[in-house]
Amino acid sequence: MILSDRDIKKYLEEGKLVIHPIDDPQKQIQPSSVDLRLGNSFLHFKVEGRAYIDPTQDSPQELMEIIEIEEGKPFFLRPGEFVLGTTIETVKLPDDLVARVDGRSSLGRLGIIVHATAGYVDPGFCGQITLELSNINRVPVALYPGMRICQISFYKLSSPAETPYYKKAGSKYHNQKGPTASRLNIDFCKKEEK
């Protein structure tokens, strides 16, 4: 069951679901989702001179540099470019909800992809949402910190998760702040230790 605006407001009022800060509830709360805003930090790959990235050998965190954008200034996402962004809002899900993050239609019509594959948010997750931003247009697109960039919708589980994200061993992205690079290399390190 997808939560309606009425249910989203109830979950927020009761503190079961946390989205902070919601700057303008009238604009951000939609009929069955909440619009989230773009933060001002971006992670950009420093891959010049590299033939490929090997997640078993490379630490993606070391391959990225942070770009901070001043308030009111645009970040230009070039054609074919891929960067990690973040939402301003921190989201905390209860154990009986999962969430789905999708791009806003208005940005999709400009060729902006908001997530490559990671649109699913586990029950019990807490943190800012990392966005996998890319531009499939043929011209750069200006993105402004503070603009509504994506929407998050919520799905009720048949029962609360037995092991929500915050209790799961190896939860790599719990309590993440800002754009967070892939931690896939940790999976390979754990296999080698066994």
Swiss-Prot record:
Reaction catalysis annotation: dCTP + 2 H2O = dUMP + NH4(+) + diphosphate
Domain of life: Bacteria
Residues under site feature: Important for bifunctional activity: 119-120
Binding site for dCTP: 104-109, 122, 130-132, 151, 165, 172, 176
Keywords tagged on the record: Hydrolase, Nucleotide metabolism, Nucleotide-binding
Role description: Bifunctional enzyme that catalyzes both the deamination of dCTP to dUTP and the hydrolysis of dUTP to dUMP without releasing the toxic dUTP intermediate.
Assembly behavior: Homotrimer.
Sequence similarity: Belongs to the dCTP deaminase family.
Protein name, per record: dCTP deaminase, dUMP-forming
Gene: dcd
